[in-house]
Amino acid sequence: MPRPTKTRTVVSEPDVCYFKPRGVPLRMLREVGLTVDELEALMLADLQGLPHEEAGRHMNISRATFGRVVRKARKTVADALVNGMAIRIEGGNYLRTGPDGAVLFCGKCRQEWPVVSSGGTPHECPMCKKEEDKKAEK
């Protein structure tokens, strides 16, 4: 049985969560999925040019894990570009850090709730009751 995926830290939600080739109706397109944490990895590595070790620290994961995440993200984007597919950005196991500290985020229904430093933070989504894997820390 594989180990559970470690919660990754991202700075913000993407403003745009869908891309498709111009001039092709959506109903005629195949679609690939890119998770929010994979998008964050692309931003850190390719847009900001951070070394994998530093980018991994930003996301609260190891350098090796960051390398696997960014490699999968690049493969997904390349597949979509080369084969003319749409890209949907959603989901993933991540913790979004906000201006006032950490918040938990449900990948299923997109609900957010704050992390309480006293340890009283609920570990399930208040909306859909999806159980969270890890306790987030500030």
Curated annotation (Swiss-Prot):
InterPro entries: RNA_pol_sigma_r3/r4-like, UPF0251, WH-like_DNA-bd_sf
Highest taxon listed in the record's lineage: Bacteria
Similarity section: Belongs to the UPF0251 family.
HAMAP family the record matches: UPF0251 (MF_00674)
UniProt protein name: UPF0251 protein Dole_1957
Species annotation: Desulfosudis oleivorans (strain DSM 6200 / JCM 39069 / Hxd3) (Desulfococcus oleovorans)
